[in-house]
Amino acid sequence: MKVLLAGAFGNLGADILKKLVADGHEVVAADMMERDLGIEKNYTFKKIDVTAPETLKGICDGCDTVITTVGLTKGSATVTPYEIDYQGNLNLLNEAKAAGVKNFTFISVIKADKAPHIPMLHAKAMFEEELKRADSLTLSTAPPAISMTSLRYSSR
């Protein structure tokens, strides 16, 4: 299976990348920069900036699945959670839909929709709502694990 993993070199993304590679998947590891994970480089690295849709053009072509761990994990003076967690993931979703990707998995947080006063959580909840409204996708959910939840969306 060909998988695009966005946010592949963050903490969670790196763990997912290692597992996908170990399981023998064809992986496109996309992030702003590549880092050494101490594994064989049995993946293709693509430099992206989810806030710049032009860097995403064609990134999902031929992929069966997109997994995104993209999101701010700490404060930033240059970007907001709405630009990354919401709009950036929406840019990626639009590219996945254009490429006819069958599955889209967004790694969010438990009860993001219950904390609208926290920008990072609110931005994630807003993107979850976009996924639910995506006209060419259907929703199925995976149970949460620890503090993360995976929302899986499959095309009809």
Where do the protein language model's features map onto the residues?
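NAD(P)H-binding glycine-rich loop region in Rossmannoid oxidoreductase-like domains
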Residues: R35-N91, E95-A99, K111-D113
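Conserved Rossmann-fold NAD(P)-dependent oxidoreductase catalytic core, especially the SDR/UDP-sugar
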Residues: E26-V28, M33, V79-A142
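Structural motif
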Residues: K2, D64-T65, N103
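N-terminal Rossmann NAD(P)H-binding glycine-rich loop of SDR-like oxidoreductase domains
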Residues: V3-H25
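Conserved Rossmann-like nucleotide-binding pocket used by diverse enzymes
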Residues: L4, V28, K46
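Flexible, glycine-rich beta-alpha linker
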Residues: I118, T141-R156
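Short glycine-/acidic-enriched loop or helix-start segments at secondary-structure transitions
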Residues: A14-I16, I39, A77-T78, A115-H117, ...
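A compact, surface-exposed functional segment
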Residues: V21-V28, M32-N42
